[in-house]
Amino acid sequence: KNILALFLSEILFRVVKETEPDSRLFEYLFESIQLLELSDKGGRNFHLVFLLRLLHLSGDNPNVESYVAGSCFDMLNGVFVDRIPMHRHYLNRQESVVLVRLLKISFENMSLYSFSRQDRVSVINRILEYYRLHLPDFPEIKSLSVMQSLFD
């Protein structure tokens, strides 16, 4: 849990730039931290759920309604498309299926989902790429390599 907390605190340090109080964000963070403290199951997916919900709160969440089987996810525009975009920031069809699956995960059901180490590493890298595309000045996350060591 300590490594996970370090990773999430680095993310929050880079993402949260609010100068005004944000009760929705505070409530989300408070409840998430409490859940992490109390949880003994599903820890391997906690950071994925946390990051995707944080995107939702920031208004930069992927548009799931545009998904059709066989489509690719255009990370620049945040939508699923039927053709590979003309830029390099997209998820292929297989990665897009994993994203759709991920977007259905919640803190309540996260322990029911399992991912291979390869999928887990790929997904976290792609989520962080999405953050870099949509949040100004979002840097490389230094604690990511430590976090990924948990997957071994």
Range-by-range predicted roles:
Residues 1-152:
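Non-catalytic alpha-helical scaffolds and adjoining flexible linkers that form interface surfaces
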